[in-house]
Amino acid sequence: MLATRVFSLVGKRAISTSVCVRAHESVVKSEDFSLSAYVDRRDHPLPEVAHVKHLSASQKALKEKEKASWSSLSMDEKVELYRIKFKESFAEMNRGSNEWKTVVGGAMFFIGFTALIIMWQKRHVYGPLPQSFDKEWVAKQTKRMLDMKVNPIQGLASKWDYEKNEWKK
Amino acid sequence: MAPEVLPKPRMRGLLARRLRNHMAVAFVLSLGVAALYKFRVADRRKKAYADFYRNYDVMKDFEEMRKAGIFQSVK
């Protein structure tokens, strides 16, 4: 009677301790996001963790076989071990895609849409151009520049034929 | 896995080989661009200036401009 009383006390203590330890375990255990993650990256060829975290029974057996001599492993087993450790091979992770077509197409579409906006603006928002853009004004302006011999060596006046009074061919 | 054994790839000196090749290409391209610029731009411009000033008569030029009426100080 006394022994069982003592035992139940000890048992209670043991149970409550183990409950505390269990509770403590779930509080102290690291969250998944704070541990190293697996990545397929060219510049990180050997990640800290393997790709497959929870092995099936057959995979566990394979890992045991891996501890023995590797020449006893078949080709398929070697590939299976590789796929446990890594998600994509280098060739797979580096494969090209057709994304560039979407990007270029999308960019061209939006540039075209911008052109429509600008056309609308020219028609409905902007005022008239200054008179210095008129054809007659520009002609008089160019004639004056040629009279002044602006850039006579390689520039504007060098392209004008002063004898024949016309642009050089 | 493929039944035939692939040849062992280059394991070392990859960066050195890349740098060597890029150096060679960069050298050739730089020389080429410099030569092209020298002949097609610089020498052509020097010749244009020399040809212009060889038989240049500044007073004749001034008279033409004066007759065209661009000056305010002299008509």
From Swiss-Prot, chain B:
GO terms for biological process: oxidative phosphorylation. Pfam families: COX6C (PF02937). CDD domains: CcO_VIc. It is found in: Mitochondrion inner membrane. Pathway: Energy metabolism; oxidative phosphorylation. Residues 55-75 are mitochondrial intermembrane. Keywords: Membrane, Mitochondrion, Mitochondrion inner membrane, Transmembrane, Transmembrane helix. GO terms for cellular component: mitochondrial inner membrane. InterPro entries: Cytochrome_c_oxidase_VIc, Cytochrome_c_oxidase_VIc/VIIs, Cytochrome_c_oxidase_VIc_sf. It is a single-pass membrane protein. The chain crosses the membrane at residues 14-54. Residues 1-13 are mitochondrial matrix. Component of the cytochrome c oxidase, the last enzyme in the mitochondrial electron transport chain which drives oxidative phosphorylation. The respiratory chain contains 3 multisubunit complexes succinate dehydrogenase (complex II, CII), ubiquinol-cytochrome c oxidoreductase (cytochrome b-c1 complex, complex III, CIII) and cytochrome c oxidase (complex IV, CIV), that cooperate to transfer electrons derived from NADH and succinate to molecular oxygen, creating an electrochemical gradient over the inner membrane that drives transmembrane transport and the ATP synthase. Belongs to the cytochrome c oxidase subunit 6c family. Component of the cytochrome c oxidase (complex IV, CIV), a multisubunit enzyme composed of 14 subunits. The complex is composed of a catalytic core of 3 subunits MT-CO1, MT-CO2 and MT-CO3, encoded in the mitochondrial DNA, and 11 supernumerary subunits COX4I, COX5A, COX5B, COX6A, COX6B, COX6C, COX7A, COX7B, COX7C, COX8 and NDUFA4, which are encoded in the nuclear genome. This is Cytochrome c oxidase subunit 6C. The lineage of its organism: Eukaryota, Metazoa, Chordata, Craniata, Vertebrata. The gene is COX6C.
